[in-house]
Amino acid sequence: MADEYCLTNFIDFSLSLSLPLKHNRIKYTCFDISDSYIIFGASSGSLYLFNRNGKFLHLIPNKHGAITNLSISANNKYVAFSTQRSLICVYVVNLSAQATPQVIVTHLDQSVQVSCIHWTQDEKQFYYGDSRGQVNLVLLSSFIGHSLLLNMTVHPLLYLDSPIVQIDDFESLLLVSNCTKCILCNTEYEEYKQIGNRPRDGAYGACFFISPHESVQPSRIYCARPGTRIWEVDFEGEVIQTHQFKTALATAPAKIQKTTNVDNNADELDSNDELLDYQPQQLQFSRVQRLSHDFLLAYTELGLYIFDVRNSSVVLWCNQFERILDCRVSGMEIFVFTQTGSLYSVQLQTLHGYSITLMHQSKLLQCANLLRQHVKYFADKARENYELKLLNQLKQLLIERQEYELLNDISVIFDAIAQCTGTALDTQSSGGSSAATERSGSMRAIGVSTTKGPPKGVYVLENAFCDNLKQQPKSGHFKDALLTVTGKFGKNIIKYKFNIFAEEQQQLVRELIPASERSLPFKDIKARYESGDVGEEEIVSRCKRPTPQAPHISPEEKTIYNLYLICKSAKFSRTHCVERYRAVFDEYAASELIALMGKLAQLMVEHGDGQEQAERNCYEMYFNYLNPELIWEVDDSTRDYIASGFVLLNAPQCMEIVRCDHCAFPLRFDNACQYHELGAVLLRYFWSRNEQLKCFDVVQAVPALLDVLAKFYLAEQNLDKVIPIVLNYGQPELLLDVGRQLNVSAWARCFEQFAELQRGRLICVNCECVSSVEQDQLTRHFFYTWNCFLNIALDHLTASDTLSLIFKWSSYIPNDAIDREFYSRCLIKG
């Protein structure tokens, strides 16, 4: 039968913790535990070190502000902590009274607060997440063979869209949970994915659940979800099932079994609890963590919750702690830190194990009351656990104390013990029983199962690492999202930066690369940790299984496949990822690279992209890689390819263009432009070769390059072209730049055309004819005002010249168009 559990060994550390505090104003703010220490951070900024029994050991002063988070490294050598002043600090644990505490500090952005810290198994690195949604890796450096730290470096890894809630890691896998989603990263393979596709809003934790027997129970990831639900996820990032504990928690809370004098009213209170009507609980778990090998611990401000996620059941929940702030786990021991600064610990123990402990401690009456509270459990357990015969000692005690009512209540347990011990004696004395035992043993040896099926409500999980059992995902519902990781550690150092703000996952195709050519990094990591003889034999047998003959793929096809994956990753992460394919592009000549881009575009079309979108994707990859100055060196066909791509990428920005009535040249337009520097170099090349027609072809398609054309005309002192371009372009920065080289007469012409422009009459740069446009078309992108225009003019003219031009064109200037500040500037300038 399934075991039942209770919380025992209650310890209150409050008295021990209060001794080192010399002032009532100093409060503990956070804590962490290890095998050797309990360490607290305080509002004073200091660290307080205790041993596991609560004895005070050491005080580490700190003047960098109140401590908000802290974490102890796996080997107990270092303590990483953060402060309210946006600092990350690392303390080298040294309990020597003569040694000066060594603390190294790094400053963060003042607007950012660290939300969680997590050490890896490597003593020289840890992660931290902040309120901005950024995850960083901190690497420590020290003298070889010494614990003396030299420096620590911070490397950004992830930029998410909300504060980080919890971080966990397993080997090269990194699990990050923020307020909207969970991200699973494989830092070794530079891949990561979002777990599930349903966003959430709130602080929900996630953790790894590593199995010691991989072949029996595969390792999993568990992610808290709204509504007291928990996702069970495999190491491929796929949600296997959802555990719903909302209704299962409509039960009485567990009482902490305190080894004190027996309360005569305890039984009455427990019976009253059973009569109460407990409602389903809608809970939010901001942190989940593994408890021992089998259970998952979660907590809220009002209670502890322990789940058996393997069997989808509630072990127990307890509401005897008030205002819980944080919890930590060590083996089966749970440490609870409250908002009042108190620390308590309890231990999770089976009921029958606790009863035997009470017997060994000679607390017989307390043990008898425990049996009365759980009569059915102990009666069933006594029939299969021979060790419980120790409880027979209670019978004599109850008779001696004349506790006949209590003896009668638990008599069924003694009957079960007698039945168990009698069966054991019969088994030892009966040859037939021996033969039966032998037969049953042989049946177990050949794999015949005599157990019943799983009880109702228990999930039977499939082995995610057995390919012949796992259902193959359909291509139409594949949710993997491979992204480029900006930083790596261990074998590779941090290389790239990236940004994730994906609100929904993009569809990728798993069959891009055949199975024989494709690595499955998330499964490979799990396979390395399969332990035991059964697991090893399974791996060997898989290796011997004949693999199907994979189709041959040429190196060029592999390159195209890789480029396709990089492109899709870049779209999802909103980064260029140019460093990932720069080395590939460097191996090709210009003409060969153009041909490769054509094949890549064709592959994108085959996998669902439109022809134009595929070409745009290829052009973006090429332009992100291309150095614009290389336009001077490439051949004409490559240059034409670049010009065509530049026009294609900027086509959407050119949809709303007001054109000349006479020659259709752009008059008003949106001056936003992609790869403006590339277009500027392209125009300079054409202009230097006297290929003005090609310049005008590009500018007519992408009028945002007219600012480059204005500078060409300005160098030739062709003001008839410069002034219309500057005024039609509608960018104050261009007027500021060009205005430095205009004299008074040129500014007079500029005033004249600006007045005409305010009347809706625009001069074409190409044919120099005047076109009339509607007022709404004029103001759609136009942001010059008389006040802005005159202030720019005053920067380059004297006050008297500016005022005389204003007087000349005063009939065209509205009364309220000029601010008082302008006239004040004129007076100051003289």
From Swiss-Prot:
Q: Which UniProt keywords apply?
A: Pigment, Repeat, Sensory transduction, Vision, WD repeat
What the entry lists under Gene3D superfamilies is as follows:
YVTN repeat-like/Quinoprotein amine dehydrogenase (2.130.10.10)
Does this entry carry the keyword tRNA processing? no
Q: Which GO terms describe its molecular function?
A: pigment binding
rRNA-binding among the record's keywords?
no
Kindly state a single biological-process term from the GO annotations of this entry. Answer: eye pigment biosynthetic process
Q: Which InterPro entries match?
A: Beta-prop_HPS5-like (IPR056499), HPS5 (IPR035431), TPR_HPS5_insects (IPR056446), WD40/YVTN_repeat-like_dom_sf (IPR015943)
User: Where are this protein's WD repeats?
Assistant: 62-101, 109-148
Listed under GO cellular component are: cytoplasm
Q: What family is this? A: Belongs to the HPS5 family.
Q: What does this protein do?
A: Has a role in the biogenesis of eye pigment granules. Eye pigment granules are specialized forms of late endosomes or lysosomes. Biogenesis of pigment granules in the eye requires molecular components required for protein delivery to lysosomes.
State what protein this is by name. BLOC-2 complex member HPS5 homolog
Organism, scientific name = Drosophila pseudoobscura pseudoobscura (Fruit fly)
Q: What is the lineage of its organism?
A: Eukaryota, Metazoa, Ecdysozoa, Arthropoda, Hexapoda
